[in-house]
């Protein structure tokens, strides 16, 4: 399936190999293919950093990877749970502009896969990264959230919230933006409202300012900022 992605080139000679462990097909043939045929309950996948600048092809490539593994095993659509790439300042390792190195584009592509591929799920790690550390230390957080996905979606454990809220829509009312989410019933209490300081808002000038935010009802975030332009 790599033929559909010309940038994933397989070196023709050993001299063309810059990094052997990153050569397309090497990890698959060396570590995965020998396991084909064994009983498969499901997969948990920790996304590495090497794809941070491939957001434009990531959703298609990752979808094909999952479908390809399932086809090889011939054991149906077994669960495939994966980690969102954690935040990191990629400006440390490249001189490209923020429009290119913004890993938010990759996280957006990862979110698309969850909605394209049946029986899959993404563990959100937006709060578990390190600005100056490309390998974040909070691996336990990743493990716990993958486990919650499995408990919720595979083992049917009740009372466990394994899925993160997913953006649905926005509505602008004067100086207030109402952001609605799917899958937020267990994330937000319908009985109480509470304030959050984890949001920013920007106007057409794309300059972000801290926003006053409230979690309200079962699936909405309301936030405002006096500093942002319309």
Predicted regions and their residues:
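Aromatic sugar-binding surface patches on proteins
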Residues: 218-221
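Short, surface-exposed alpha-helix to beta-strand junction/turn motifs within ectodomains of secreted
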Residues: 189-209
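Mature catalytic domains of secreted/periplasmic carbohydrate-active enzymes
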Residues: 103-106, 162, 215
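Conserved small/polar residues in nucleotide/adenosyl-binding loops
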Residues: 223-230
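Immunoglobulin-like IPT/TIG beta-sandwich domains and homologous Ig-like subdomains
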Residues: 209-211, 225
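Surface beta-strand/loop "capping" patches
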Residues: 153-193
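Conserved, well-structured interaction surfaces
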Residues: 1-145, 152
């Amino acid at each position: 399936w790599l033929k559909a992605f010309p940038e994933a080139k397989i070196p023709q000679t050993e001299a063309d190999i810059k990094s052997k462990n990153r050569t397309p097909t090497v990890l698959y043939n060396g570590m995965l293919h020998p396991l084909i045929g064994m009983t498969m309950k499901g997969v948990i996948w920790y996304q590495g950093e090497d794809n941070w600048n491939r957001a434009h092809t990531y959703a298609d490539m990752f979808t094909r990877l999952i479908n390809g593994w399932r086809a090889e095993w011939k054991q149906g659509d077994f669960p495939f749970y994966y980690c969102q790439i954690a935040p990191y300042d990629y400006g440390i390792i490249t001189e490209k502009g923020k429009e290119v190195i913004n890993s938010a584009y990759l996280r957006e592509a990862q979110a698309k896969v969850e909605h394209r591929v049946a029986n899959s799920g993404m563990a959100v790690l937006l709060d578990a990264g390190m600005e100056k550390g490309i390998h974040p230390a909070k691996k336990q957080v990743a493990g716990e959230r993958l486990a919650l996905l499995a408990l919720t979606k595979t083992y049917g454990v009740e009372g466990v919230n394994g899925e993160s809220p997913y953006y649905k829509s926005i509505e602008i009312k004067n100086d207030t933006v109402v952001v609605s989410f799917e899958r937020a019933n267990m994330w937000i209490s319908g009985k109480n409202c509470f304030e959050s300081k984890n949001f920013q808002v920007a106007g057409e000038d794309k300059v972000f300012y801290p926003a006053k935010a409230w979690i309200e009802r079962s699936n909405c975030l309301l936030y405002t900022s006096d500093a942002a332009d319309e």
